[in-house]
Swiss-Prot record:
Signal peptide: 1-22
General function of this protein: Facilitates L-arginine uptake, as part of the AaxABC system. The arginine uptake by the bacterium in the macrophage may be a virulence factor against the host innate immune response.
Keyword hit for Transport: yes
Key words of the record: Amino-acid transport, Cell outer membrane, Ion transport, Membrane, Porin, Signal, Transmembrane, Transmembrane beta strand, Transport, Virulence
Cellular component terms per the entry's GO annotation: cell outer membrane; pore complex
InterPro entries per the UniProt record, alphabetical: Carb-sel_porin_OprB, OprB_sf
Any GO BP annotation: amino acid transport
Protein name: Porin AaxA
Topology in membrane: Multi-pass membrane protein
Stated family: Belongs to the OprB family.
């Protein structure tokens, strides 16, 4: 059965499914950052939460009054005319003024992540005669602990216009990663792991998003063009961002993913009902790293395709989300193999203080050393009602190692267990001690475990 037939069947079946018209939330990594509210003055009341969940769309056919319509120059004019934040400058008042006057939402995440790891040295696997044609002695791999990472991720969304013809929004997000001392990639080699100890194992610059989105009236259809990444939708609230949730590679993203970190393309998103979301799109196949915007690649006529379906019901326990992502990548010089991948995510609030999630993902081909992963976990937000940033989580991931992609693999599976506790300090700063336990490292047959201790300091505005 071809990928196109599978995708078409899945989308058609979901589009005709009768779902409950109730509270829902479709996860998007950068949209969620822009909407977050950690300041106590911004926290919504229970009544507002109920209204927001139960009426996320305004499906009224009545035209928007002229007094409420926004033209192209409205953001600039409104910002100049309303400078109330100057009476008392603060981060909250500045963000509120930008949102109300200029239709602009901004978010900034800056984290510092030192990680202590053990073991700190190992002997590289001995290459066989079959590999190189001759025997070669083992070499010693050493790394100094800790490795220190800093990650800077600003995001912004600017509403260009909002009228009876629809809404136009420009979104931008950039990720900058730097290291002191050792990198996480070298630390992972020292511990002989198949997966990294964090989401960004080396120095990186990623232009994750630069898009223009046209939302049509009734907000059921959205067309987006520009540079984007599937990482923004492939996951749930706490297993897709190492700055806010879990840190390890297998629990902070899809470890089997072979799609781009950011590439030019377009996608169409449709909401058949209030609790369902369907998306189909394509991207330039050549830009794998997403380090820059490469316009010339669009003329090379090789594209990756994806289909995405999400169902976000609201049951008696609370809101949840269940999604499926299917994608195909083409063979290009930067990625010398065509692949087909999938990712199934499920998350559910059992109560306001307990959130459970799971992921099953996989990929064909020999590009990724991890070709299947099964993960699950639970998170408790603000358990003590002390600070909105407080978060406690524990999760486990079982990674299936692809022997053909990892010639030195000594084991077929590698397991990571992780726990963390985020402690909020005011509305914007938090500290999170984190512990990772790796059982049966894939490349280290003489060791049963490896350990990583981390303390994440994060500024989230």
């Amino acid at each position: 059965m071809s990928f196109r037939s599978i995708l078409l069947t899945a989308l058609l079946s979901l589009s005709f499914t009768n779902t409950m018209q109730a509270a829902h939330h479709h996860y998007h990594r950068y949209d969620d950052k822009l909407r977050r509210q950690y300041h106590k003055k911004d926290l919504p009341t229970q009544e507002n939460v109920r209204k927001e969940f139960c009426n996320p769309y305004s499906h009224s056919s009545d035209p928007i009054p002229l007094s409420q319509q926004r033209g192209v120059l409205s953001p600039i004019c409104d910002l100049v005319s309303e400078c109330s934040f100057l009476n008392g400058i603060s981060v909250r008042s500045l963000k509120q003024t930008l949102k109300n006057s200029a239709g602009t939402q901004v978010a900034l995440d800056w984290s510092i992540l030192p990680q202590w790891f053990n073991p700190r040295s190992s002997w590289a696997p001995k290459l066989s005669i079959r590999d190189l044609g001759y025997g070669k002695p083992q070499s010693l791999i050493e790394a100094d602990s800790p490795c220190c990472q800093t990650c800077f991720n600003p995001s912004a969304a600017i509403t260009i216009y909002d009228s009876s013809c629809g809404k136009g929004v420009v979104q931008v997000s950039y990720t900058l990663v730097r290291y002191w001392r050792e990198t996480a990639a070298l630390a992972g080699q020292t511990m002989m792991l198949a997966g990294s100890i964090n989401d960004y194992p080396a120095r990186q610059n990623i232009f994750s998003q630069l898009t223009f989105s046209q939302t049509f009236p009734n907000e059921r259809v959205n067309l987006t063009v520009g540079q984007y990444s599937l990482y923004s939708i492939d996951g749930t609230l706490y297993n897709n961002d190492q700055q806010l949730g879990f840190i390890s590679y297998a629990l902070s993203q899809n470890p089997t993913a072979t799609y781009s970190s950011g590439s030019l393309g377009a996608y169409l998103q449709v909401a058949p009902t209030e609790s369902t979301c369907l998306q189909v799109g394509f991207q330039d196949a050549y830009n794998i790293s997403g380090s820059s915007i490469k316009w010339n690649n669009l003329t090379k006529n090789k594209y990756n395709f994806h289909g995405y379906a999400s169902w976000a019901p609201h049951c008696c326990l609370g809101p949840g989300q269940y999604s499926v992502l299917l994608y195909v990548t083409r063979k290009v010089p930067e990625q010398m193999m065509q692949t087909m991948g999938w990712s199934v995510n499920a998350s559910q609030y059992i109560s306001s203080k307990l959130y459970v999630f799971g992921r099953y993902s996989g990929v064909t081909g020999q590009l990724s050393p991890i070709n299947r992963t099964y993960s699950f976990g639970l998170v408790s937000p603000n358990l003590l009602n002390r600070n909105p940033q407080d978060l406690f989580g524990v999760a486990c991931a079982f990674n299936n190692i692809h022997a053909s992609a990892f010639q030195n693999a000594q084991r077929k599976y590698e397991t990571v267990i992780e726990g963390f506790a985020t402690i909020g300090c005011g509305p914007y700063i938090s500290f999170a001690p984190d512990f990772q336990l790796y059982l049966y490292p894939a490349l280290r047959p003489n060791k049963q475990s490896a350990r990583v201790y981390s303390v994440r300091a994060n500024l989230a505005i």
